[in-house]
Amino acid sequence: MGEVRTVERSSAGSAALELLVHGVGGATPEKMLNDPRTVRITGDETAAVHRRAEDADADAPAADATTTVRDHGGRPVPEAYVWSNLTSGNGTRALWLLLLPFMVVNLAHWMRPAAREGTRAVRLYGLLVRLAGLSLTVLLVAAACEVALDLTAWQCAGTHACAARHSWLGFLSPTLSHGGWWSPPGRRLALAALVPTALTGLLWYLSHRTWRAYESQEPLDRDPEPRNGPAHTALSRPGFWYGRRLVARLRAGHTAAGLLTVAAAVGTAAAREDHRPGGPPVLDALGRLLEVSLAAGALAVVWAVCRRGRSEHRLDRRLDAQLVHRLPLTALVLLTLTLVYAAWERPGWQSSGRLPGDATFGGIALAQGTLVIALTVVAHLLHKGPDGEPAPRRDSHDTAAPPQTHGSGDPLAPDRHHRTPPAPDTLVDVLGVAIALPAETPTETAALPSPRLSPGETGESDAHPETPSAARGTGVGPAKAGARPGPPGSGEAGGEGMAWSAQDETGERGAGAEPRTGLRSPGDGGGGSAGRAGAGGPGGARAALRGLGGPAVAMLGCALGGVMSGGVSQRVSDWLDGTGTFLDGPPVLLTWQASVIPVLLLVLLALVGLLGRRTWLLTRAERVAVAREYDADPGDPARTGRIARARSMATLTDRGPLVVAVTSTTTLLLGAGALVGAFGTGKTPVRAAQGAGPFVQGAAQAGQALGSWLIGLGFLLFVTWGRRAYKDASARRTIGILWDVGTFWPRAAHPFAPPCYAERAVPDLTWRMSTWTRATGGRLVISGHSQGSALAAAAAWQLRPSERRRVALLTYGSPIERLYGRWFPAHFGPAALVALHRDVDCWRNLYRLTDPIGGPVRLSGDDCGPEVDHAPLADPLAYGRTEEHPLPAPILGHSDYQADPAFAEERGRLLARLHPEVPVRHA
């Protein structure tokens, strides 16, 4: 046996790997590797790593016994990690649409403001979101009970005309079956209870199956990093992507809640009959005992959901076995006893009106509104911080902004690039910007400056080689002291450090009318300071809605659950009672909730008009900027308009906080009004408006009619979309894009939410990078597009610090800061991104102004070293026909970043910068 020593080898003979991770919508390995012949190296049909066929043996032992791997002349071996089947998969994934409210409320858990871990406010925030998720489970099962028990078994089967209209209900009708065995109300309810029970069982099965496939994928087992340290982020914890214990616990609690909801719907109807004067004493006592048992079961469910949150600081392989098995089993036993109790013979019992328990939906709506308000208070306190003062906010007028540079390196003249107000979050901010912005206001602002270092700066700290330098992650300059020198400005080594200039990136490129420096960064209404690391302060000033994104999204999830519940109830009621004369219909509250939908649509229509006006004004201003950048004066007006329109439309993503704020606030207010109207009058809006003025009566009639029609139409469209996605792969991929964003996060608030694909993808990438770097000692670039960049960053965080320093990160079209940094500030906020920037060997980010998803990472300044962001890429590459582009260049937006020459340049610089130490075996 020979000993293994570590010696330095030049980059020309080092093992190098380029790991490609695709984004939303998926991709094939053939397209990612640009080769029709690919082979699967590791993985399965769901997610796998592929290589070109010619590179299949790149990791095989070399013929020379002195080296551990074959020498490929320094050429990086490209690998493609394909994970699209994790979200699009087979046709059954289309059924995940039914779980959309659960997914939305689960997102709210991860949207909390940045705060110190372990505080009571942080724990309270998670507890409130879990309770909101529990209320959605109860709401969904209650809606199934409303359809099966109330509308079908209680009302329709108990009405001769309705049962005669639907012959399949004849055996349940007391008149049509001539008093058959199933005709008593209790037995009808017991039989109909099988429908919501089966729904609960289906949800349990889907959650259990996906739990075994996703949450049970073990990440790398390693020591946790210090809590609340300067480089601390929850994404670096060993157990972050291993939620096996919590999901099992929540699944037990939510399953029991669903079964107890069914038992309560059946048992309360029978108990009310037994509690009347002259009722059978034995059944009366059993009914009261059953009610106490159901209340105790409900308390046990709430305790199980609230008692424990996530355990992320270690791989928690334990399971609460007794709770996981006994709680649902106990609830099932109670449900069985309730069905037997309800089916007992009760002479003279007849069904009339609506099923008792009509107030259930009102109680759920009240509880959800209270939880959202409490969540808002907690989120506001977390965002303000412990001192009670809001985090400092820097905007585009901050005098500390770094100097902006043109392609020539000179400061931009004030009359060439102007600034606009920072991207607004609140309704007042956006109204002011949209209304006050004149048509002639230039919207072009300085691009992020191209990174430079003074001669002699290396971007590395020689005095403390083990400490990640503030200059690491530049993507250029030497990686190690004594690296091979390069020519001045090459960015490869020597004393020039980070030496390529803005002229190399975005300067004038000849007669092709290609653009000069770009515009403002997406999501940034202002200049450079808004993009500097730490611009948000500890509280994150760029956090969406001032840290209230979580409560707003939780409100939307509850509203979506209400719309789905009301929609299915309304459609089934209309189907059973075609003339509207047989049945009392669904609960009054559901009718009120449907009646306020037209008002919500009017508000959203006004908001769309406001955003449309702003986009139109911005497009006019962008036309001037486009003509100046491409030297296209006069140019082609249609071509200029398309480019300007693409840029202005891309900024609509940054208006997302406004849309969410207006929608959630309006929904909360209208929901409160519907609750007051339903409980205050006990009548539908039309009946409640009788005797009022003609205008009020007309508004009530229009609202109720339109609301009923709209909610039914929405339900039909929802089912149609799901059915189409079940059969059509392209539609399934479209739904997969929704899941790409919504199911990135683990299931922390709702076990019935669609599974978190990152709990499979992140361990896959982490294991691949860790094992490869340890086996070869080589260099590695992980390249992520769109959502793949979030996976790449999450995987890098999961590496050991020593392995993290051997990894370079290339992101393009990345939503890491533009979406994740704003909506999830506790996990992708400035502090977390700065820590990642310092830990990895180098990081470069590419984006376009026409990209509605990707944007800058905004890391620059003295606190984190030189910038990560490349200046905005030109899109299109050329305005007209040129030698390099004889045909009109397309506007690429979010796709085909590899088509830009800057991509190959940045990729080459990252690979050249990594100079690893490779283990060499000596006899």
Where is each model-derived feature located?
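N-terminal membrane-targeting/anchoring modules of bacterial envelope and secretion proteins
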Residues: M1-P438, R516-G518, G523-P754, P763, ...
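Long, intrinsically disordered, low-complexity tracts enriched in Ser/Thr with interspersed Pro
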Residues: A400-D425, A436-G525, S529
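Lipolytic serine-hydrolase domain surface
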Residues: D728-P763, S814-A923
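Conserved acidic catalytic loop of the alpha/beta-hydrolase fold
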Residues: T766-T776
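Short coil/turn segments at beta-strand junctions that form active-site/ligand-binding loops
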Residues: T776-R779, R805
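Gly/Ala-rich beta-loop-alpha elbow adjacent to hydrolase catalytic centers
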Residues: S783-A792
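Active-site signature of alpha/beta-hydrolase-fold catalytic machinery across serine-
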Residues: A794-Q798
